[in-house]
Amino acid sequence: ALSSLVRIGTSTWTYEGWQGQVYTRPYAKSTFARECLGEYCQYQYKNEPLFRTVGNDATFYRPPTANQLRRYLNQIPEDFEMCFKVWEKITIPSYAKQPRYGSRAGQPNPRFLDAKLFNELVLTPYRDAKFEPHTGPLLFEFQRHGLSTDEFCARLDGFFSQLPQDFRYAVEVRNAGL
């Protein structure tokens, strides 16, 4: 058996291409993402559940709601953890020139590494849903940022010093300059 310290999972559970492999139950396209998490958690390898964690990158675009987290609780086993990407409003120093940002496109992000916003809008749903025992590392993805390495590290250090210690955090830097 695999050590209990090791968790195997994937970056998402919502890959429809796994139907017939990981997923054996039929799912309507409209409800697939909401309903298949429980079956993902039950997937067996050598008569043992294989997946004990999964990522959720949809939370990069908006924080989860307490109701979403409660729906997950109804589908996951007691020892299962989910890793969530942190909302981009916290992790991007300026908005890319993309239509999805509307009037903010190309503008600085005044909420970059805003610990108060993170505590209020990102962490609160986890607490309200009592999801903390199932929360794996919260993943901060940083892409291009236009800051010097020293400035970025100083801002990051200041930010993390304001966060509660009862959650775990991870940083993914997608910037060749660092």
Stretches found by the model and what they are:
Residues 1-178:
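Residues lining hydrophobic/aromatic ligand-binding pockets adjacent to catalytic sites
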